[in-house]
Amino acid sequence: GATISESSRQLTSAELTPQDIRDALVGCLKNAMDRSGYDDRLLSRIAVSVQGVTDVAGSVLLWSPITEHRDLPLAGWMRRAFSVPTSVSNDCDLMARALNRREPKRYSTSFASIMLSYGVGMGLFLRGTIVNGLNTSGTEFGHMVFQPGGALCRCGRRGCIEAYAADYAIRRAARGEPEDTMPPAPADHIDFQQIADLAHAGDARAIQAIEEAGRAIGTGLCSLFALVDAFRIALIGRGTLVFDIMEGAIREALESTVGGGNINDIDIHCFADEKPLVAEGCAITALLVLDEEIADAAVV
């Protein structure tokens, strides 16, 4: 599918009521359709990306760091507004779907897409199938524990991988702030390029913070590899600006758990911008459903 129209809004999500969130979603799509010149009635499928946990059916946003509200029926809102079937997916799952379609030779059967940005998340493919939880979208890699009782995470708990590897966590450590410093809201802008520049210029605290992020990521991967064996990794987002500093710590953390394999054989590839992958993932999700409907109609 080709992009025919776009619409965006800057919102302080933490201040929004459920009705505000609903109005923003519906309004954005209506505005995009108005700009396109096409009638809303031509919509066939809607795919929504979210940062957070959805129900396994892909209808409800159960939890997200961007809002205090829970159990938001995003699919129902869009379905009622546009009379179109709607799915809701975790953003990292969508990135994994996009990579699977964009580079099928590299990302075909078993791999993980790990976002390193305002948060840390994972989309996981095993044997050609996206992995989710029993009841939720699951695979919350960023909220696996790295250091019990450690640094404060945006989720409110302590010691999560995200509390060391997200942009706010690296900035906190690079500034020498206490580990219990409250993380900023996801909408707050963090100039990660500045942190990268400091580290590349030799700033000791910035380098140490980035290396600790690498250890957190590598330790989390160790746990996964112990369960299902090693797989390819795609690191996505602005955190990849410092991959050259982070990589050694990641591979060092992996060294003791790869079951005798060579850690340098584990393919790690970087993508600096997550937004195009999320958009592709949404398009793929919607188009795959339409393909199935067309195929089923042809069989009948």
Question: Where does each model-flagged region fall?
Answer:
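ATP-binding/phosphotransfer module of carbohydrate and carboxylate kinases, centering on a glycine-rich
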Residues: 1-42, 83, 102-104, 157, ...
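Phosphate-binding/catalytic loop of phosphoryl-transfer enzymes
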Residues: 42-49, 53-169, 287-300
